[in-house]
Amino acid sequence: MTDAAGAAEEVAPEEEPALVHGAVSALSRGQLVVHPTRERYLAVVGALQEDGYQMCVDLTAVDYLAQESRTLPAGVRGQRFEVVVNLLSFTDRRRIRVRVQVPDDDPRLPSLFALYPGTEAQERETFDMFGIVFTDHPDLTRILMPDDWEGHPLRKDYGISRIPVQFKGTPRPPGAGGGETSR
């Protein structure tokens, strides 16, 4: 296996891509980015943890609804969703980004909770907002939206008009007349 610290060259589109733990990698704005397949995602992140990446700083998703043909390293096929994970090594003062493609017709990935317990809320938020299911997550329930909410608001095909807006009483300054609230 290749150590993550050793892959430090930018990969031109026509060159053979560099590999980190069997996953395509490249530099993006000076940061190493690893693109594992969905099937290798958990193994690659586990190997990066063994390389000294002690903390998962962030886990989120991007919906590329109309941009599945965006520029990616050779060997990486774009999908509608991309889960982005940022890892940090305190001892070596290094960061690495993991970007995994997730198809629209089966939006699921293994949970990182067993490796990084701090991802519990991040995976729940990604599930709540994008509908990506993290298998083996201990409590994959909504975290931001009400339990009975339909849909996933950060998906690009989620209709904005579907969001109900509730106007309850608007506070008025004392002495403005009409009572304490208006309706």
Regions found by a protein language model. Give the residues of each.
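Terminal low-complexity/charged segments
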Residues: M1-R183
